[in-house]
From Swiss-Prot:
A single GO BP: folic acid biosynthetic process
One GO MF term: kinase activity
Cysteines paired by S-S bonds: none
Enzyme Commission number(s) from the entry: 2.7.6.3
Pathway, per record: Cofactor biosynthesis; tetrahydrofolate biosynthesis; 2-amino-4-hydroxy-6-hydroxymethyl-7,8-dihydropteridine diphosphate from 7,8-dihydroneopterin triphosphate: step 4/4
UniProt-listed CDD domains: HPPK
Domain of life the protein comes from: Bacteria
Protein name: 2-amino-4-hydroxy-6-hydroxymethyldihydropteridine pyrophosphokinase
Keywords: ATP-binding, Folate biosynthesis, Kinase, Nucleotide-binding, Transferase
């Protein structure tokens, strides 16, 4: 089984509805959803602010390629058009980190891969408060491998420029889970 940390964001149209479409599209795979944050756009493109959240999901039959295909399918379903890098989008679904679990062992191992279409963990996640703040909100023990070393997400945030953190503002918006099965623990280390 794999557990994935997904960063979802939108800054076109009904931003909350696009985020909700991603959560709904993942269905019972969803383990946890962070609060929704209003965030300053990342990159040099002038555009509307984003709504961002983090979703943690389990996929008994999923590997990293299957998660990537699922993320791209969610984006296509939202009418995502790939244009300008870091430009506006209806829905952005990024794989941040993926963990492989085995029935024979306790805990999980972070998947590290560098392929032409997928690098895990996400190579810029540690630089993005709009990823780390929501992730920390749903998993206070979260760790991310950076430069070959596991680092606590709270520590990465503490080391970030204050202006980067200040660009991530908690909203009163919420994403709803449609769950037909019981909730599971969030931290992959506790499975």
């Amino acid at each position: 089984m794999t557990r994935v940390v997904l960063s979802i964001g939108s800054n076109l149209g009904d931003r909350l509805a696009w985020l909700q479409s991603a959560v709904d599209g993942l269905g019972d795979a969803v383990v946890a959803v962070s609060p929704v944050y209003d965030t300053v756009p990342w990159g040099a493109v002038e555009q509307r602010s984003f709504l961002n959240a983090v979703v943690i999901a389990d996929g008994p039959a999923y590997d990293t390629k299957a998660w990537l295909c699922r993320a791209q399918e969610l984006e296509r379903n939202a009418g995502r058009v790939r244009g300008q890098r870091w430009g506006a989008r209806t829905l952005d679904v990024d794989l941040i980190s993926c963990y492989q679990t085995s029935g024979a062992t306790t805990g999980a191992v972070e998947v590290i891969t560098c392929e032409s279409n997928l690098t895990l963990p996400h190579p810029r996640a540690h630089l993005r408060a709009f990823v780390l703040v929501p992730w920390l909100a749903v998993d206070s023990d979260a760790e991310l491998t950076v430069a070959g070393r596991a680092q606590r997400v709270d520590r990465l945030l503490a080391e970030m420029e204050p202006t980067e953190r200040e660009g991530v503002r908690l909203t009163n918006l919420t994403l709803k889970l449609k769950r037909s099965s019981p909730a599971r623990p969030v931290s992959p280390k506790s499975d």
